[in-house]
């Protein structure tokens, strides 16, 4: 389970990251990333719509995505906000495939380096 410090909980934060973040498409997900100030905790949010499947299937996909993000935190990932939107194909994907999608999104963000401006708080507005 992700710690509270590693979760995006505000709808405004979700909206801000999805609208202003760098978009990285994977086979089973689309990720939106924003760099944050150095030393800040990495935060994650998940969007799993009914197109993915039944409630049981959606929760399974969400738990797998959370576990993949937890591994990134354990590996020392900091200073990024990441929202992962699961595509319908995620319903049939196994854990390694979902983990690869998330890891690819983060690695592409790291290659871009400081080109992404640090995320402003949702209170600052769009």
Tell me the role of every PLM-derived stretch:
Residues 1-126:
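Positively charged, solvent-exposed patches that mediate nucleic-acid binding
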């Amino acid at each position: 389970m992700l710690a509270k410090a590693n979760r995006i909980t505000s709808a405004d934060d979700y909206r801000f990251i999805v609208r202003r973040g760098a978009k990285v498409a994977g086979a089973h997900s689309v990720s939106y990333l924003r760099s944050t100030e150095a030393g800040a905790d990495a935060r994650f949010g998940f969007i799993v719509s009914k197109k993915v499947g039944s409630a049981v299937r959606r929760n399974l996909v969400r738990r797998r995505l959370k576990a993949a993000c937890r591994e990134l935190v354990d590996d020392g990932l900091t200073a990024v906000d990441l929202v992962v939107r699961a595509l319908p194909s995620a319903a049939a994907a196994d854990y390694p495939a979902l983990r690869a999608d998330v890891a690819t999104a983060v690695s592409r963000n790291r290659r871009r380096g400081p080109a992404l401006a640090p995320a402003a708080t949702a209170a600052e507005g769009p």
